[in-house]
Curated annotation (Swiss-Prot):
Gene name in the database record: RRG1
Protein's name in the database: Required for respiratory growth protein 1, mitochondrial
Localization in the cell: Mitochondrion
UniProt keyword Phosphoprotein, yes or no: no
Family of this protein: Belongs to the RRG1 family.
Any single biological process term in GO: vacuolar acidification
The organism's place on the tree of life at top rank: Eukaryota
Primary location class: mitochondrion
Length: 365
């Protein structure tokens, strides 16, 4: 059984010795830090990549190139090193879209930059793979047959599935608008969610508001955390100064002292001030700032609760979008019935303009 060269002691010793020699020679013979980094990075990648090579010829070739690299370094032939490294550099992985475009070029005279053609090829590729997995199509299919015979069948199957989903949605009845919210800190930002304003149709102002509230809430939390840290240090200073004056160590429950209560009368929102003068001098300024931050946070909560009640529910946006959603459903239902009666019975797969995808596009589906 073939064995990895990395497990042969003599080979391992030779490679490590050569690698150390090259690493020592790189800064001596090359004065460009960028080029030094490039050489080291390429060597590291190649050593890791071929660590488990079992091909003797591959290992022999790479060791020769490794030795040649060391000789070029000693002789100062930097251009030859660049030429030697070019084929060793890792190629960038092709994007899936690029592969599709390359495949489209081989299909014939098509507009490879057209997104619609790319989408059609996606559908065709998925159709062929699915049928081949089921044993209904051979492994090799000529490009002409793919383009002229299988593409209409694939598009028709895809359109049939789309038609089924449209029918099911219409069968479920008119969609209704509803209230939804996103939580940012203590705030619940309410907005209307409906088929009319989903995705890109959603209000840009709403997105700006949510991002602003997220930023402000996080800033408020960070400020409170910073104040808590400062309050702890301030309490230590107060305890120390009190001890210097009265030789007594005071005890204060700091979390309770900094506690802020909402939804109660303003005069009792916070605990009374400490009886110790030093605590008042050191901790109370930080405490006041924390109470202001808490107060600001609860004010925003009240604002969004009122916004939900006044602007959304009582004949506002919710009623408007609910009405528009029902109008859209009625229009789509009328178009679907018209399409089912006038056009669907006469669909023909292989005639452009009368195939199912064209019919759905014509009626806005």
């Amino acid at each position: 059984m073939a064995q990895n060269f990395g497990k042969i002691p003599s080979h391992k010793s030779y490679v490590l010795s050569l690698y150390r020699t090259v690493l020592r020679n790189i800064p001596k013979c090359c004065h460009s830090y960028a080029f030094q980094y490039e050489i080291k990075k390429t060597l590291s990648i190649q050593l890791f990549k071929h660590k488990h090579d079992k091909s003797s010829w591959s290992v022999y070739t790479l060791l020769n190139e490794f030795s040649l690299l060391n000789n070029c370094l000693l002789e100062g032939k930097l251009q030859e090193i660049k030429n030697l490294m070019k084929p060793l550099k890792k190629m960038k992985k092709q994007l899936k879209t690029t592969k599709i475009l390359n495949s489209l070029t081989s299909l014939g005279d098509v507009k490879t930059n057209d997104p619609e053609e790319v989408r059609r090829f996606h559908v065709l590729s998925a159709y062929i793979k699915r049928k081949q997995d089921l044993g209904l199509l051979p492994a090799y299919i000529p490009k002409t047959y793919q383009h002229k015979l299988l593409l209409p069948l694939a598009l028709n199957e895809h359109a049939c599935l789309k038609l089924f989903h449209i029918q099911q949605k219409l069968k479920n009845g008119p969609p209704s608008a509803g209230l939804s919210y996103t939580k940012e800190g203590r705030n619940q930002i309410w907005f209307v969610r409906s088929p009319i304003n989903k995705g890109r149709q959603q209000s840009k102002k709403l997105g700006i508001l949510i991002r602003k509230e997220r930023k402000d809430s996080q800033k408020n939390i960070d400020n409170l955390n910073f104040c808590e840290i400062n309050a702890a240090w301030a309490l230590h200073e107060a305890i120390w100064e009190e001890y210097l004056e009265s030789k007594k160590i005071i005890k204060v429950n700091l979390p309770k002292y900094l506690e802020y209560a909402a939804n109660i009368p303003k005069s009792t929102k916070c605990n009374p001030s400490s009886q110790y003068q030093k605590v008042k001098e050191w901790v109370d300024p930080v405490r006041e700032i924390m109470f202001e931050l808490h107060s600001k946070s609860f004010q925003r909560v009240e604002y969004f609760n009122k916004y939900k009640e006044k602007l959304l529910k009582n004949g506002g946006q919710l009623a408007y979008f609910d009405k528009k959603s029902k109008e859209m459903y009625a229009k789509r239902l009328t178009l679907f019935r018209k399409m089912s009666k006038e056009t669907l019975p006469y669909v023909t797969l292989f005639i452009e303009g009368r195939d199912l995808p064209s019919v759905l596009a014509k009626y806005g589906f």
